Swiss-Prot record:
This is Probable portal protein. Belongs to the podoviridae head-to-tail connector protein family. GO terms for cellular component: virion component. Homododecamer. It is found in: Virion. The keyword RNA-binding does not apply. Forms the portal vertex of the capsid. This portal plays critical roles in head assembly, genome packaging, neck/tail attachment, and genome ejection. The portal protein multimerizes as a single ring-shaped homododecamer arranged around a central channel. InterPro entries: Connector_podovirus. Pfam families: Head-tail_con. The keyword Cell cycle does not apply. It comes from Bordetella phage BPP-1. Keywords: Late protein, Viral capsid assembly, Viral genome ejection through host cell envelope, Viral genome packaging, Viral penetration into host cytoplasm, Viral release from host cell, Viral short tail ejection system, Virion, Virus entry into host cell. GO terms for biological process: symbiont genome ejection through host cell envelope, short tail mechanism.
C-alpha cells in the first residue's frame, strides 16, 4: 500500500508540474520552430525524428546568432583550452601556505581532467544553447565509473521543475522514452512491467517505452541512517502505464544532482526568459520580409503575362529563347506583362539589414564577434582590451547567475563524487575542517574584474612618472603586495608565484652572498696590498725603509 500511495503521489505531482509548465509550452514551441527546430520535446514521442523541421526559417540569422552566443559563452566561461576556475580557502593566511596552494592547484587540475574526460563540456554547450533559446536548461549529473561523472542533457518540454521558497530549483520530473533493450539493461527484466517483459521475450528490443524520472526532496527520512532510502533527495524511475505497485528503481542523492539554470527571472517565476524571447518578433519579421523580397524578385524576374484571347489553348513558350505565335495585329495583341513591374527593393533591403542587426544584438553576437568585426586595424592592444572589457561588462548579471546556478553546483557535485571515489590527494594538515570556495578565472570572469587592474595600472604608471622627479616616493609602493594582488586579479596559476617565506629566504641568501662577496673583495684587496709591500727591497734607500727606520728609532 505504501508503494501504491507513493506512486500515486508521484503521478499526481507530475500532473501538477505539467499544468504549471503548460503556459510556457506554446512560447517554447514557437521559438523552436523559428530558431532551433531540432530542439524541444513537446510530445513524448518527439525523439529521433528525421522529418524536415526548418520550413519556417527563410533567413537563419537568428539561428546563427544563437550559435554564436552558445559558442561565446562556452569559450568565455568554461573553455576546455584553459583553466576557468580555481579553489581557495578564503583565508588569506592559509592561502599563502605553499602546501595549501599546491594541494588546491592539484585538485583543480584533477577536476579539469574529469570535465575533459567526461561529457561535461558537451553538456555545458548544449545548456548554453538551450538557455539562449528557451531561458531554462537542465542536465542531470550522475556518477560514472569510468569518467567519474556523466551528464544527461535535457531539452525544453522534456522536463518540469519546481523551486523552494528562495527560488532555488530543488525538484525535477522528466518524461522520456527508451527502447526495451535499454530498459532491461538499465533496470533489469524483473523490474520492468509485464508489457515490457513480453516485448523483450518476443524480441521487440527497439520498441519505445515511456518512463518518468522524479527527483525531489525526501520528506519522510531518518537523518541518522545513511542508506539511499534516507538521503536528502529521492530518485524514482517508474512506467506511467504499469501497475501501481511497481517501480523501476528507487534510490537517493545526498544533494540535488540536477543543474537547472535560468537566463533571467522575473518575480516568482520558476522558468526563465531568454534572448530568443526578446528577439522572436524581429525573427518573425525577418522571415516575413525575406518572403516579400523573394516574391518581389519573382515579380521582376518572372512577371505575370497578358496574352490575346486568340492565344488561349495555344502552346505558349515562356522559357528563355522560346517561340510563341500570336496575332500581333489585333488590338491588345502580342504577349506583354500584365502590369509594369518596377519594384524598388532598396527600402526593404535596408530594413532587413536593420532587423538582422537587432537580432544579433539581442543574442550578444556583436559582443562576442567584436574583434572579428573590427574596422580599425590601427587599434593598439590596450585599446582592443579596453573595448573588449567594456562590452563584456554587459554580461555581468547573466554571468553571476551562470556561476550561481551552473558552475558552482557542478564543481560541488564533482568534488563530492571525487570524495566518494577516493581519488582526492590527501590534504595538508592545516586544511582540516576548512571550507573551500570557488573563484572563477575564465575570460568573462576576468573581464568583470579587469576594471580593478586598470586602476592599478594607472596608479603604478603615475607613481613611476612621479618617481622620475622625486625617487623617494617609491618608498610608498609595496612591490611584493602588488605582485600578489595583480596575480590574483588576473587569475595567475599560484605555482608561478613564489610564496612570501621563500622570497624572504631567497633575499636573505642573496644578501649573504653579497656580503660574502664584499668580504672576499676586502680580503683580496688586503692580500694584494700585503703582497705588494712584501715585494719591496728594504735594504735600499726608499720611502718604506725610511718609514720603517723612523718607527724603529734609526736615523
Amino acid at each position: 500500500m505504501a508503494e501504491q500511495t507513493e506512486r500515486k503521489l508521484l503521478l499526481s505531482r507530475w500532473g501538477q508540474l505539467r499544468t504549471e509548465r503548460e503556459s510556457w509550452m506554446s512560447h517554447w514551441k514557437e521559438i523552436s520552430d523559428y530558431l532551433l527546430p531540432r530542439a524541444g520535446r513537446f510530445f513524448v514521442q518527439d525523439r529521433n525524428r528525421g522529418e524536415k523541421r526548418h520550413n519556417n526559417i527563410l533567413d537563419n540569422t537568428g539561428t546563427r546568432a544563437l550559435r554564436v552566443l552558445a559558442a561565446g559563452m562556452m569559450a568565455g566561461m568554461t573553455s576546455p583550452a584553459r583553466p576557468w576556475f580555481r579553489l581557495t580557502t578564503s583565508i588569506p593566511e592559509l592561502d599563502e601556505s605553499a602546501a595549501v596552494k599546491a594541494w588546491l592547484a592539484n585538485v583543480t587540475r584533477l577536476m579539469l581532467m574529469i570535465f575533459a574526460k567526461s561529457n561535461t563540456y558537451r553538456a555545458l554547450h548544449s545548456m548554453y544553447e538551450e538557455l539562449g533559446a528557451f531561458g531554462t536548461a537542465s542536465s542531470i549529473v550522475l556518477p560514472d565509473f569510468d569518467a567519474v561523472v556523466y551528464h544527461h542533457s535535457l531539452t525544453a518540454g522534456e522536463y518540469a521543475i519546481a523551486a523552494d521558497n528562495q527560488g532555488r530549483v530543488n525538484t525535477l520530473y522528466r518524461e522520456f522514452q527508451i527502447t526495451v533493450a535499454q530498459m532491461v539493461r538499465e533496470f533489469g527484466k524483473d523490474k520492468c512491467s509485464t508489457t515490457v517483459q513480453s516485448l523483450f521475450d518476443r524480441g521487440a528490443l527497439e520498441q519505445w517505452v515511456t518512463v518518468i524520472h522524479a527527483i525531489e526532496p525526501r520528506a519522510d527520512r531518518d537523518p541518522s541512517k545513511r542508506d539511499d532510502r534516507n538521503m536528502a533527495w529521492k530518485s524514482v524511475y517508474f512506467e506511467p502505464g504499469a501497475d501501481e505497485t511497481r517501480t523501476l528503481r528507487e534510490s537517493g542523492y545526498r544533494s540535488f544532482r540536477a543543474l537547472c539554470p535560468r537566463w533571467a527571472l522575473v518575480g516568482g517565476d520558476i522558468y526563465g526568459n531568454s534572448p530568443a524571447m526578446e528577439a522572436l518578433g524581429d525573427v518573425r519579421q525577418l522571415q516575413h520580409e525575406q518572403l516579400r523580397k523573394a516574391q518581389a524578385i519573382d515579380y521582376k524576374s518572372n512577371p505575370p503575362l497578358q496574352l490575346p484571347v486568340s492565344a488561349k489553348n495555344q502552346d505558349i513558350s515562356t522559357v528563355p529563347g522560346g517561340l510563341s505565335y500570336v496575332d500581333a495585329a489585333a488590338p491588345n495583341g502580342g504577349i506583354r506583362t500584365a502590369f509594369e513591374v518596377n519594384l524598388d527593393l532598396s527600402h526593404l533591403l535596408a530594413d532587413i539589414v536593420d532587423v538582422r542587426e537587432r537580432i544579433k544584438a539581442s543574442f550578444y553576437a556583436d559582443l562576442f564577434l567584436m574583434l572579428a568585426n573590427g574596422t580599425n586595424p590601427q587599434m593598439t592592444a590596450t585599446e582592443v582590451a579596453e573595448r573588449h572589457e567594456e562590452k563584456l561588462l554587459m554580461l555581468g548579471p547573466v554571468l553571476e547567475r551562470m556561476h550561481n546556478e551552473i558552475l558552482d553546483p557542478l564543481i560541488e557535485l564533482t568534488f563530492q563524487r571525487m570524495v566518494e571515489a577516493n581519488i582526492l590527494p590527501p590534504p595538508p594538515q592545516e586544511m582540516q575542517g576548512v571550507d573551500l570556495n570557488v573563484e572563477f578565472v575564465s575570460m568573462l570572469a576576468q573581464a568583470q574584474r579587469a576594471i580593478a587592474t586598470n586602476s592599478v595600472d594607472r596608479f603604478v604608471g603615475n607613481l613611476g612618472a612621479v618617481a622620475g622627479i622625486k625617487p623617494e616616493v617609491l618608498d610608498k609602493f609595496d612591490a611584493d603586495r602588488w605582485a600578489d594582488t595583480y596575480a590574483d586579479m588576473l587569475g595567475i596559476d599560484p605555482e608561478l608565484i613564489v610564496p612570501g617565506n621563500q622570497v624572504a629566504l631567497i633575499r636573505k641568501q642573496r644578501a649573504d652572498q653579497q656580503q660574502a662577496a664584499q668580504q672576499a673583495a676586502l680580503l683580496n684587496q688586503g692580500a694584494d696590498t700585503a703582497a705588494k709591500l712584501g715585494s719591496v727591497d728594504t735594504s735600499k734607500q726608499n720611502a718604506l725603509t725610511d718609514v720603517t727606520r723612523a718607527f724603529s728609532g734609526y736615523t
